[in-house]
Amino acid sequence: MTEKKNSREKKNPREAKVTFEGLVTEALPNGMFRVRLENDTIILGYISGKIRSSSIRILMGDRVKIEISRYDSSKGRIIYRLPHKDSKRTEDSKDTEDLKDTKDSKD
């Protein structure tokens, strides 16, 4: 009876995929991108459904996590956009702090 149970078990489909970090080098139509991986191979990446439905923008120069199938290593699914270290938001907040400091010094 245990033999039947073991034969019915399904493997996790995520086991057949490998995750890498990469850099978007080129934006192509229909949510496709050329991504340079850490090991300097360039593959074709497409946006996952969650990123598409969340309308997260992916641009050239963005760092992304990409999931690649072991069976076809020429394509991968972009599953996460990594945050920028030099993001625009942090620069904007520094500018507003500088403005506050200059206003305080004038008073």
From Swiss-Prot:
PROSITE patterns: S1_IF1_TYPE. It comes from the Eukaryota. Residues 81-107 are annotated as: Disordered. Residues 83-107 have a biased composition (Basic and acidic residues). It is found in: Plastid, Chloroplast. One of its GO terms (molecular function) is translation initiation factor activity. Residues 8-83 form the S1-like domain. One of its GO terms (cellular component) is chloroplast. Keywords: Chloroplast, Initiation factor, Plastid, Protein biosynthesis, RNA-binding, rRNA-binding. Belongs to the IF-1 family. One of the essential components for the initiation of protein synthesis. Stabilizes the binding of IF-2 and IF-3 on the 30S subunit to which N-formylmethionyl-tRNA(fMet) subsequently binds. Helps modulate mRNA selection, yielding the 30S pre-initiation complex (PIC). Upon addition of the 50S ribosomal subunit IF-1, IF-2 and IF-3 are released leaving the mature 70S translation initiation complex. NCBIfam families: infA. Component of the 30S ribosomal translation pre-initiation complex which assembles on the 30S ribosome in the order IF-2 and IF-3, IF-1 and N-formylmethionyl-tRNA(fMet); mRNA recruitment can occur at any time during PIC assembly. This is Translation initiation factor IF-1, chloroplastic.
